[in-house]
Amino acid sequence: MYQIYTDRFCNGDPSNDVLTNEYCYIGEPVHRVEDWGRYPAQMDVREFYGGDLQGVLDKMDYLQELGVEVIYFNPLFVSPSNHKYDIQDYDYIDPHLGKIVSDEGELLPDGQRENRFASRYIDRVTNKANLEASNEMFAQVVAEAHRRGMRVILDGVFNHCGSFNKWMDR
């Protein structure tokens, strides 16, 4: 079994990377990490390395050469953290890990901490085209894994979600 923490695995599609100041998480702006060799920050749940499902597809030969029989994915659903355990939407794969086909809106202005102004993030993670394309990307990963005789386990954490989600009436 090979566990994949997708954000830290392989960046196969830089166009879907979380951008610095795209939104705030736990009161501070998120940050895109350029140097994969850099030591992680203390509050590194706000740091994104850009690994994605395209990167997993790109490394399927490598995984097969290792003799991987099962790929165990950390959560992949829409979530503001890099670990994805605080899920916003269980229906869709996070477009930052999948595919972004619509990329409208603005980054947060310097000093702004309110995500209602994070229009680029809102578009990226709520636009139906992005969400559907991301689910399709995951289906491609699963199909390719199965074609190679590998099985896929998804860490679904269905017993809890993040506080920023579509079910809370605020």
Indicate residue ranges for each PLM-predicted region:
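N-terminal structural segment of carbohydrate-active enzymes
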Residues: M1-R151, N159-D169
